[in-house]
Amino acid sequence: MPKGVLVIISAPSGTGKSTICRKLLQRRKDLRYSTSCTTRAPRPGEKHAKHYFFLGKDEFKRKIQRGEFLEWAVVHDNYYGTPRSYIESALKAGTSVLLAIDIQGAAAIRRKMPESILIFITPPTMESLRERLTARKDASESVAKRLANSRAEMAAAKNYDYLVVNDDLETAVSEISCILTAEGLKVSRQDLVELAPVLAHVN
């Protein structure tokens, strides 16, 4: 059985990352979205093990000590982490996993799982990104801060395997889907023991 692919997507705020991930999951039945752990309280409509694994802080800290996270961070006094066992079991079963995460988290996971695939999504221009952020009706100082953060994030794009420009949503989704197909066909991801009888007859 071919191994699953861990696909990590990063993008500046307002680039359409969430929409792209949702479209990918609708299109690719061989792809599963990674469920993260958090210590924050569930929001209305959120379900344990579907949207997040909701944990107490003490339990989360014990998991940190046991090395059960591929990466973790504290955001607004709440802990967030990517569970190692959830992803490793899916990949072993031949299921690819999609993970949307920031550049720091992506770098941390790449160090632990160098075979993961990193895809960075950018807007076509900074002006188009400004327009998207402004359309959200954020305060002007918030837009300026997000744009500054976006420039810093895009400087890290050189550390990724693929760069996708989200000028057209369907095109961007198709390009990422093609990347997943190609990566899944790599010889390094195949079970060569299982294929040995077939390969033995290849001249």
Regions found by a protein language model. Name each.
Residues S10-P12:
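P-loop (Walker A) phosphate-binding loop of NTP-binding proteins
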Residues C178-N203:
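C-terminal accessory "lid"/substrate-recognition subdomains
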Residues I20-C21:
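Post-Walker A alpha-helix
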Residues T38-V97, Q104-A107:
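ATP-dependent small-molecule kinase phosphotransfer cores
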Residues K158-A172:
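Phosphate-binding beta-loop-alpha motif at adenosine-nucleotide cofactor sites
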Residues K17:
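Conserved lysine of the Walker
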Residues R40-G45, E68, L91-S96, I103, ...:
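A glycine- and Lys/Arg-enriched "phosphate-lid" helix/loop adjacent to the NTP-binding pocket
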Residues Q26-S34:
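Post-Walker A helix-loop "phosphate-sensing" segment adjacent to the P-loop in P-loop NTPases
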